[in-house]
């Protein structure tokens, strides 16, 4: 039983080796003699179990041994290609810093410059700062109005108007302070006069009270004297 199993395994190995040789050629150092060596070792191992053995069928090696190297010689290895970065930077998650400088890709549409708006902040101001030109709020009017129709004297007129506004505010503050001081002095003078009159009036009332009280005291003394009974007259002889 063991001998039959061994013979079946040997035949299976030979058949597989033949199929591999016919399909892919004798490559990678594959040789049928290796299988024969293995079967001989197996035979020596199992000799003490049975005496009947079957002679293995030998397969003929290919006539031209150089054919197995033809396949290796004809194979060419290609260099792996490098992946290029996308030419459009917008493909990287759709994030690009240049979008901040473009009014056309805003969600609410491109902003139109308004006629009455002046001194606003626009994308052109950002471009001027990035390019090193500096921020010029007096030259560039709001809404990105940086065309050729800008007035070069608008900055001077704006500065003049600002200075005039500050000067008028200071003048009004000074006038208000002077008028407040004058009204305070007038009120203080009026209160001082009123206090003097009140003091004189109080003094006069005190004098009248003193004058009126003196005769009253004299009269009361006289009344007390007349109210006493006359002394008794001595008897006449």
UniProtKB/Swiss-Prot annotation:
Residues 218-227 have a biased composition (Polar residues). One of its GO terms (biological process) is positive regulation of neutrophil extravasation. Highly expressed in the nervous system, including brain, dentate nucleus of hippocampus, granular and Purkinje cells of cerebellum, brain stem nucleus and choroid plexus. Expressed in peripheral blood T- and B-cells and neutrophils (at protein level). Almost undetectable in bone marrow-derived neutrophils (at protein level). Also expressed in thymocytes (at protein level) with higher expression in cortical thymocytes than in medullary thymocytes. Expressed at high levels in testis (mostly in germ cells and Sertoli cells) and ovary (mostly in granulosa cells). It is found in: Cell membrane; Cell junction; Secreted. InterPro entries: CD99L2. Residues 102-111 have a biased composition (Basic and acidic residues). Its main location: membrane. It holds the Pfam family CD99L2. Residues 1-25 form the signal peptide. Keywords: Cell adhesion, Cell junction, Cell membrane, Glycoprotein, Membrane, Proteoglycan, Secreted, Signal, Transmembrane, Transmembrane helix. Residues 228-237 have a biased composition (Pro residues). O-glycosylated. Glycans are attached at residue 154. It is a single-pass type I membrane protein. Residues 183-237 are cytoplasmic. The chain crosses the membrane at residues 162-182. Residues 51-66, 74-84 have a biased composition (Low complexity). Belongs to the CD99 family. This is CD99 antigen-like protein 2. The gene is Cd99l2.
């Amino acid at each position: 039983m063991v001998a039959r199993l061994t013979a079946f395994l040997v035949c299976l190995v030979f058949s597989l080796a033949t199929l591999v040789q016919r399909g892919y050629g004798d490559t990678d150092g594959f040789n049928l003699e290796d299988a024969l060596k293995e079967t001989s070792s197996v035979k020596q191992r199992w000799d003490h179990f049975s005496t009947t053995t079957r002679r293995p069928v030998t397969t003929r090696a290919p006539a031209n041994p150089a054919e197995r190297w033809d396949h290796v010689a004809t194979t060419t290895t290609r260099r792996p290609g490098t992946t290029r970065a996308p030419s459009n930077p917008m493909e990287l998650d759709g994030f690009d810093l240049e979008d901040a400088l473009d009014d056309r890709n805003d969600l609410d549409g491109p902003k139109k410059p308004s006629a009455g708006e002046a001194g606003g902040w626009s994308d052109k101001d950002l471009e001027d700062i990035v390019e090193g030109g500096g921020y010029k709020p007096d030259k560039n009017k709001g809404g990105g109005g940086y065309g050729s129709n800008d007035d070069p004297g608008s900055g001077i007129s704006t500065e003049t108007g600002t200075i005039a506004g500050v000067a008028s505010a200071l003048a009004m503050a000074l006038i208000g302070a002077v008028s407040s001081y004058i009204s305070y002095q007038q009120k203080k003078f009026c209160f001082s006069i009123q206090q003097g009159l009140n003091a004189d009036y109080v003094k006069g009332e005190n004098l009248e009270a003193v004058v009126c009280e003196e005769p009253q005291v004299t009269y009361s003394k006289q009344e007390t004297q007349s109210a006493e009974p006359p002394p008794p007259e001595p008897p006449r002889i």
